[in-house]
Amino acid sequence: MPPTQAESVIKNIIREIGQECAAHGEIVPETLVAFMVKAVVLDPSNGFNTDRTLTKSDVQKLVKLCVNRLLDSKNPSLDTIKMQVYFDMNYTSREEFLEEHHQVIESRLSSVSREITDSRACVREELESLYRKIVSYVLLRSGLGSPTDIKIVREATAALQSVFPQTELGTFLTLSKKDKERQLKELTMIVTGIRLFNRDCGKGGEGIDDLPAILQEAIPATTQHVDSQLEVVQEQAYRYTAILEKVAKNPLMSQELQPYMLREALYNVRQCEIFLQVILSDIITCAQEVEMMIKQLEAQLEQLKLTVKSKTAVPTSQVFPIFIALSNLWTSFQDETVLISILSNLTTHLEPFLGAHDLFFPEKVMQVLLDGVTVKTDVCRIKEHIEDKVNVADFKKLEWLFPETTANFDKLLIQYRGFCAYTFATTDGLLLPGNPSIGILKYKDKYYTFNTRDAAYSFAENPENYIDIIREKAKRNAELIQLLELHQQFESLIQYSQMKEVDKRYIKPITKCETGTQTDTHLLPPTIVRSYEWNEWELRRKAIKLANLRRKVTHSVQTDHSHMRRENCSQVYPSKDVGTQSMREGSSRVPRPQIYIAGLRGGQTKTTYGVKVNLTRAVDET
């Protein structure tokens, strides 16, 4: 049958079963019906063959069996399956919840944000209306008061005008849609920070709840409520375990106690215990986060007071980051408040799935069944065999892990939720907690624990046999698939998204042992690269040299037209001083002027008369 046709047939079967149950006054969710259909088909006692197509009679038989099981209100097994379906549909991890919660807030604000970003206001009335919408958006996004309360609106408007006056709407309208959305978020955080600071100073904070104080009161109350529920469930589990342990030792009691469905009741309380432990773990995480955030909030407010102390004006670069940090912290407080509320509601809604215990096992019946039985807690059972350990030398082909030799011992994903595989397989479905101190068996990359050393040795002799027995028991009791985390063996019963979560939690062990190593002095020959250069400029010089060589022409790359070419060169002698000598001197010159003046020594009383005499020789005489 094609996959699409098979899906159509299954949907029709689920719809028909839902209608049948509704006709009997029982409204059953489709998820529960779908799980029940697959569980009934999987049970070998019902005679369905998953390898062949269902006939009309098979479909009628399947519908009848599913309706009967879904209407059996006195069956703890059905309550367990309902509990599992409810928890899977309503519980999400902390990270997923915060992501989904923020997505819901964004979707609710999308219409208001769209009205603001798509606005084309021009006239004064339209701009005033747009500004009022921005104030409403800030209040809705921050969650600090109702936008219909006049006092809250006035306070938010005053805070917004201090950082975003109405005169800046023109600039805001010119921005792109993404920039508008980003600015709206920033304005919301800044206004939220301002209002929180004013509230701390006693100058405002209308409509702002004291979330830190509320959480400090709600978390202990929720923790106490979950703890009390967990104690009740664990006490019931210990009593059922003690009775079933007594039955395992006395097979004659098995027939007498068959109508009581003790085994199914044990599965029911163990499943509830696991869910309550998950919830309690999340609450503890919330408490740790809130404690840390309260310290951060006090530190941010103190820093802000020191920054704005006795100052008329403070740079926005100093206070805006603190306002934004305050807003983010307050958003985290709001997230924790919603998360605590959801976890508390989950705990409350798990209680109705335990109603069959008071009906089947009133206190008088339990006292009779517990006659001569010692009720032991899980801790007591582990302490009884705390000193027993598996001798690794007895197993040559199997690997055993111990706390002393495994680094992440506490983080290993133990098969069957940590219950003893051997005890569950060899008894009538008795769930006893495994003792990791005895040793964890690693078999085919899976890890198994046991309540005693003898159980560990017996299981190790033939692991496949006991694993098959447990698988067959899970087919007959579908609630065991979720309870013992057998998802990988029954992938058809769970969604792919859940399979990814199973793979995500799978952690491989990190084993530790005493080892020693010794290295030779010179294990390998030295590899000194002589051509290595650390200097950048030397590398550049070599690169230039290679680039020049690339342009050179060598014989290996000659062509028909260039193979006769060669480089031309010329040689000259360097210049030097040269002198010559002859036998005769040759020269030429002109007469030297010889002019004299006579009669310069005259008498004292007579006038002196000088006579100029030119004795220069003629040119031709020389």
UniProtKB/Swiss-Prot annotation:
Its job: Essential for sperm motility and is involved in the regulation of the beating frequency of motile cilia on the epithelial cells of the respiratory tract. Required for the establishment of radial spokes in sperm flagella.
One GO CC annotation: motile cilium
Pfam families: FAP206
BP terms from Gene Ontology: axoneme assembly; cilium movement; regulation of cilium beat frequency; regulation of flagellated sperm motility; sperm axoneme assembly
Keyword DNA-binding on entry: no
S-S pairs: none
Name of the protein in question: Cilia- and flagella-associated protein 206
Keywords: Cell projection, Cilium, Cilium biogenesis/degradation, Cytoplasm, Cytoskeleton
The family this protein is said to belong to: Belongs to the CFAP206 family.
Domain of life (superkingdom): Eukaryota
Chief subcellular location: cytoplasm
Compartments, as annotated in UniProt: Cytoplasm, Cytoskeleton, Cilium axoneme; Cytoplasm, Cytoskeleton, Cilium basal body
